[in-house]
């Protein structure tokens, strides 16, 4: 794998158009709109990070921190940037943020057919601890709930 010029930054307004396009590519009918993404800029419980490669938006991750709980809402990488460690860097940023905020856990949903994502999450210590029936559409699919618990003293 070649080295890439990767920067993980806080979501900025100038990233929204690219993220709305990425949402359509990755999530089609369940994609978040530009307006939905824009609302997260002022949501006090939302933490969204953008992956930039050479100044271009390559992907992003979004999460909510509520009390001592962290929920990942979205992880997406443009197809041309996949298999380059970008999703790994985004997950790592989310985990570092959640841990620094002393959350008890970080949780997410994933399609059972998304074996690459499942393997990535497992490599960070996430374990399946639930199932949401008929969660995804086009195609219809359940969602695996995966959680990583943080050890607190």
List the predicted regions and their residue ranges.
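Extreme N-terminal starter segment of soluble prokaryotic enzymes
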Residues: 5-8
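Conserved catalytic-core motifs of GNAT/GCN5-like acyltransferases
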Residues: 109, 122, 127-143
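Conserved glycine-rich acetyl-CoA-binding loop
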Residues: 56, 74, 78-92, 101-105, ...
